[in-house]
């Protein structure tokens, strides 16, 4: 796939993912700006997460996670997360176990303070 068609496919995936997240109540989710590739997450508006969006048949999860980690460290905008989808499959998420535990404990503590 050529550079431009790969970019177009990636952009469509970002818009699709943002729409999916919006439909699930994450109303602030938006696809990143096409002109700012590498300067902002692929999908923004989810506090505490740096989202790298991928729409590929051939999985390169470690490579994608390394990219998300490097970008999250550079942008200082949240935990690195890869959300990807293959054709006719559901969206999947990659998050380190330590980040999952930290986020889950934060959610639990937040729920306890609401009671």
Feature roles, as predicted:
Residues 1-115:
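Catalytic phosphate/metal-binding cores of nucleic-acid and nucleotide-processing enzymes, i.e., regions
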